[in-house]
């Protein structure tokens, strides 16, 4: 009963010896090893979550949550207010300028955010809208909240166009107050932020902004119902997503002086921490 019987016959064919192979101890050892691996994996997972959780709490304690652009009280002027050739719409960079000045062109020609509204006009989006019982995806608030700068009508300037997609102010905040002051001779980044500019240069605030659509928040969330209607699965990793989007800024000495600088490992860790916090907020 404790193993597998093995029978041996002697040369004369009369004597035989029955032995039992000790299989139970071997099986028990394998089970113990498996449990050990499981315990180790569990320990590593708990440790990782504890570390990330600690990072979350540290950053949340140090940084007050700013209002996201969708919920700010500022006037949103639209892309046209930024796209002048002497502002951010130059075809090429200006060598003696403190900024590149071709930011709009980079966004328009290379950034997927510029095409976010157009996605709502695709056959797939139309099918998703139909499955949800909506007339059109490009007019539905639950779609526009993340595929455009869908601020209330009373916060839209006459030059504002929904079809601009995830435009300048969807990430940088309504420019109603800072559009004039940010080019003044005595302008400072601190004052621009005080006038409504969103701090996308800070990894914590950038992660919170990106996750509000690429995962969801209290204002907008890709629910199970939307996923069931055919919406693609959501995924996000701050450092990778930041690196994949064409930069419309240059991290030079002036940038580091005004805004600081973060390496990829730091941005990745902060992104993971903020993603965990966002998931916990959704669960709780």
Name what the model sees in each region.
Residues 130-169:
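Post-signal peptide N-terminal segment of secreted/secretory-pathway proteins
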Residues 64-70, 91-130, 157-166, 174-284:
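Primarily the internal scaffold of c-type cytochrome electron-transfer domains
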Residues 8-10, 60:
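Cysteine-centered motifs
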Residues 86-88, 147, 172, 214:
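Cys/His-coordinated zinc-binding microdomains
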Residues 47-59:
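Bacterial N-terminal signal peptides
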Residues 75-83, 139, 164, 206:
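Short metal-coordination and nucleic-acid-contact micro-motifs, chiefly zinc-binding Cys/His arrays
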Residues 82-84, 143, 168, 210:
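Short cysteine-rich clusters marking metal-coordination/redox-active sites
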Residues 60-64, 76:
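Boundary at the C-terminal end of the N-terminal hydrophobic targeting segment
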């Amino acid at each position: 009963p404790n193993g597998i019987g093995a029978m041996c016959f002697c040369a004369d064919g009369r004597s035989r010896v029955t032995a039992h192979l000790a299989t139970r101890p071997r099986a028990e050892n394998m089970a113990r090893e498996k449990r050990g691996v499981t315990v180790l994996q569990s320990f590593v997972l708990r440790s990782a979550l504890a570390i990330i959780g600690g990072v979350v709490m540290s950053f949340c304690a140090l940084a007050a949550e700013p209002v996201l652009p969708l919920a700010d009280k500022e006037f949103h002027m639209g892309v046209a207010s930024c796209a002048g050739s002497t502002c951010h719409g130059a075809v090429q960079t200006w060598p003696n300028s403190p900024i590149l000045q071709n930011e709009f062109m980079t966004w328009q020609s290379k950034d997927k955010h510029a095409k976010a509204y157009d996605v709502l006009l695709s056959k797939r989006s139309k099918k998703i809208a139909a499955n949800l019982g909506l007339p059109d995806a490009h007019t539905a608030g639950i779609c526009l909240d993340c595929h455009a700068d869908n601020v209330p009508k009373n916060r839209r300037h006459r030059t504002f166009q929904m079809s601009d997609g995830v435009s300048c102010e969807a990430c940088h905040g309504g420019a109603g107050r800072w559009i004039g002051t940010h080019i003044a001779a005595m302008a400072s980044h601190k004052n621009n932020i005080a006038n409504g500019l969103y701090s996308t240069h800070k990894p914590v605030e950038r992660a919170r902004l990106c996750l509000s659509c690429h995962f969801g928040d209290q204002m907008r969330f890709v629910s199970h119902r939307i996923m069931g209607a055919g919406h693609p699965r959501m995924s996000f990793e701050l450092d990778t997503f930041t690196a994949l989007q064409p930069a419309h800024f240059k991290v030079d000495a002036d940038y580091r002086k005004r805004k600081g600088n973060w390496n990829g490992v730091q941005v990745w860790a902060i992104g993971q921490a903020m993603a965990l916090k966002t998931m916990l907020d959704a669960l709780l």
